[in-house]
Amino acid sequence: MNKAFSVLFLFTLILSLAGSAFSQTVYTGLIFDAQTLTFTPSASVKILDEDGREVYGSAYVSKDWADKHGIVSYVKDLAQAKANQRVAGNPLVIKAIKVTGPNNKDLVISNDDAHRIRDLAKHLNFLDAGKVVIIVP
């Protein structure tokens, strides 16, 4: 009976751990929504947290990729953003909270969103692969 209990316990534990591992959503890229902001698209855009720390920019993307494709794509609405091949599948959508930098060319996101992106980036390659789209006004 102990052996049966141990096997059942082990099986339940494995299923539980597998379930938690698969419950983390896998994102295929990032969409930053700047539709309501006075944002100026730029080839050298930076995404910053509320403390001014860079979350994404040219330093995160290989020079070869950036030269061929740019570090972001710009679109006019969420439907275009989600359909963009750069992030297609299951992109994470983040709302930009303000603009900053010369000519309003950089976006600021909440510290919570920045933390989430940094956490995801530890396990996914969407930042260094330039899988980023920005929705512009």
Language model region names:
Residues V7-S16, S20:
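Bacterial N-terminal signal peptides
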Residues M1-V7:
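Positively charged n-region of N-terminal signal peptides that target proteins for export
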Residues M1, S20-P137:
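Domain-level marker for long, solvent-exposed, non-transmembrane regions
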